[in-house]
Amino acid sequence: FPGLNLALAAACDALGVRLIAVSSVTASTWGANQPGFTWPEMEAMLVEGGVIRPASVAVAAGGAADAAADLAGEDRALASRIRDAAAVRLGVPALRPGSFEEAVGLRLRAYRRAAAGAPVALYVNVGGAEASMGHSPAILGVGTGFVTGRALRGTRGVTAWFAEQGVPILMLLNVRELALRWGVGL
């Protein structure tokens, strides 16, 4: 989903909106899944090159428990090294949770700290990060696009927490569905 991340950053910049993000190293088969080209590494290159403004306020390994716990030992260690290096390049904390619940809490603290008391106008979830979406089977029925808090009940991730606070939610996950809905050619 690096294209969605970049499009979101560009849209926020064009609108004069401050983007606050927590970026994950691990990704699915939809891009940003090669060492050297994970999203946090791409973001660092784009920021260093003056292409986009910094958005990430923290970097996580991603995957299970936001700690790449679903990866084999060597791959988990690589994800951790990439997380740490990208966090240094971006000048933000590296999140090191010990559980799913801690991962959600660390992300929420990062968002609240960066917002500095200002209200969050919209929460945009790009991709399928477990800490953001939760790990309940209910998440599979949430859909894509603007979703209601009712659809998120029982998911327990960061997205559900923001929905419970009355923050509008935009899910950018099923790109094909979004393109068909809005008449965008594939």
What are these regions (language model features)?
Residues F37-V51, G141-G149:
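Acidic, Ser/Thr-rich peripheral helices and adjacent loops at domain boundaries
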Residues P119-L122, A129-L186:
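C-terminal functional extensions of proteins
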Residues S23, A60, V124-V126, L172-L173:
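Short beta-strand segments
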Residues P2-L6, V25-T29, A64-A65, G127-S132, ...:
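Gly/Ser/Thr-rich loops at beta-strand to alpha-helix junctions
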Residues S99-L108, G127, G149-G154:
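A general structural motif
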Residues N5, A9, V104, L108, ...:
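Short amphipathic alpha-helical segments and helix-helix/interface helices
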Residues F1-T38:
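Membrane-embedded segments
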Residues E41-P119:
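A substrate-binding/cap region within the structured catalytic cores of diverse enzymes
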